[in-house]
Amino acid sequence: MLFPDDFSTWEQTFQELMQEEKPGAKWSLHLDKNIVPDGAALGWRQHQQTVLGRFQCSRCCRSWTSAQVMILCHMYPDTLKSQGQARMRIFGQKCQKCFGCQFETPKFSTEIIKRILNNLVNYILQRYYGHRKIALTSNASLGEKVTLDGPHDTRNCEACSLNSHGRCALAHKVKPPRSPSPLPKSSSPSKSCPPPPQTRNTDFGNKTFQDFGNRTFQGCREPPQREIEPPLFLFLSIAAFALFSLFTR
């Protein structure tokens, strides 16, 4: 892993990449901790990218990996002389566990550094020389086996802490979950069946007669009419027998 403090390696790699694609072009690359996002001076252009980097807290020695390390570049060309200058700022991050700690400087692998500079050279060649984009290696093939979950930690990001310029441009925004769509209403009226009648027991002497509530009705048909209950039927039978005896005398 290499520190941005070893910037001579960055400058050398940048010059080599420029000479491969644009021989004779003279561009310089310098670190500048004063440039800010969306704050390029008149005539300068801005280029931003996020890459994979590793941090270590200088207070508690805790280390963490982030895929949201922001790299900012401001460029000024002199196309008549085929030369220009680029200024780069590498933003740090704070430890999530320590209160009031400083922004730590990230470390990068050699492959990541080359990718950062490839992206910068690509932008310069396309913007100022009309070159086609050079195919780059994806992050997945750089040999970095790390698990990266969760949104961008804006509270501990140096780029996001610049109040005059707001959050860094490449901070991930979490989309709110979509509410489920309401179920469609049916146009035809629903037919509800009447609740089944409750079971009732009625005692007459030593016999128990169960009400018709225990009968099962199919579908929504109306229940059958109730039959004459035994006490009324017995009374009518006695009255008919008495009248018959009266007329036969």
From Swiss-Prot:
One of its GO terms (molecular function) is zinc ion binding. InterPro entries: R-trans_p, ZAR1/RTP1-5-like_Znf-3CxxC. The keyword Zinc-finger applies. Residues 199-208 have a biased composition (Polar residues). Induction: By interferons. Upon rabies lyssavirus infection. It is a single-pass type III membrane protein. Residues 173-208 are annotated as: Disordered. GO terms for cellular component: membrane. It is found in: Membrane; Cytoplasm. The chain crosses the membrane at residues 228-248. Keywords: Cytoplasm, Membrane, Metal-binding, Transmembrane, Transmembrane helix, Zinc, Zinc-finger. Changing C57S: Almost no change in rabies lyssavirus viral genomic RNA binding. A zinc finger (3CxxC-type) spans 50-162. Pfam families: Zn_ribbon_3CxxC. Expressed at low levels in olfactory neurons. Upon viral infection, highly expressed in brain and different cells of nervous tissue. Residues 1-227 are cytoplasmic. Belongs to the TMEM7 family. Interacts with TASR16. Interacts with OPRD1 and OPRM1; the interaction promotes cell surface localization of the OPDR1-OPRM1 heterodimer. Chaperone protein that facilitates the trafficking and functional cell surface expression of some G-protein coupled receptors (GPCRs). Promotes functional expression of the bitter taste receptor TAS2R16. Also promotes functional expression of the opioid receptor heterodimer OPRD1-OPRM1. In addition, acts as a potent IFN-inducible suppressor of pathogens including lyssavirus rabies, influenza A or yellow fever virus. Mechanistically, associates with the viral replicase, binds viral RNA, and thereby suppresses viral genome amplification that replicates at the endoplasmic reticulum. PANTHER family: RECEPTOR TRANSPORTING PROTEIN, RECEPTOR-TRANSPORTING PROTEIN 4. This is Receptor-transporting protein 4.
